[in-house]
Amino acid sequence: MELSGNTVLITGGATGIGYALAEAFVEAGSRVIICGRRLNRLEEAKRNHPEIDIIQADAANPSDRARLLKVIVENFPSINILVNNAGIQKDIDFAFGELNFEDIQEEIKINLEAPVILSAMFIPHLKGKKNAAIINVSSGLGFVPAARMPVYSATKAGLHAFSIALRHQLSRVGIKVFEVVPPAVDTELNPEGRAKRANFKIDLKPAEFVAGVMEELKSDVFEIGYGPSKKYIQASRAELDEYFRMMNSRW
């Protein structure tokens, strides 16, 4: 993938990995539009990087998705890269917890439904564009699920499968499909869960992770891991089962 000269839309682009990707694409010489739910964080990103365009939109909301498509097509018709990055993560205990079905549905809508539907909506506008691509941000937990985050793990496993199938289909129309597979990165994801695990320290910063991602994108590596998540991508089923036992031994 060429990193410069693109028009890139990044969902969930105001914070964390999405924001680091936005900074990296701007630095590489691409035009970047970010969308997200929180206007204050979008405006903060805009203050830091005036060249970034911002759109307040909830990727999980059908009417917001339709509006987002309309705004992009009308104002940024050169769009050639869609980054499905928006995501949420929740600790959910199906055995002993008080289940909130709205929380479960929200996690599925944002993490899996949104990237699938947005891909379908934007593909007609990516066809025929130079350097066209869809970049899906999944998770190492899509390969080795965390028992305390069953819905999150399931949505990311679904996004992994979707990325494989979509890559095969879109190879016929010149659109590349990349999957970025983060390990644990120090972001605002799941603050409630992290508060319960104060002794679990995450050292990897979004900018460091994304620097590695950009190098892999440049080399057309279609499944991009980092540290433990790179091992998960390359592991056999027996190895994945062992990683699962190790990760969840105290659950």
Residue ranges and their predicted role:
Residues 28-44:
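Conserved glycine-rich Rossmann-like NAD(P)H-binding loop of the short-chain dehydrogenase/reductase
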Residues 179, 195-232:
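C-terminal helical subdomain
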Residues 57-68:
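The beta1-alpha1 cofactor-binding region of Rossmann-like NAD(H)/NADP(H)-dependent oxidoreductases
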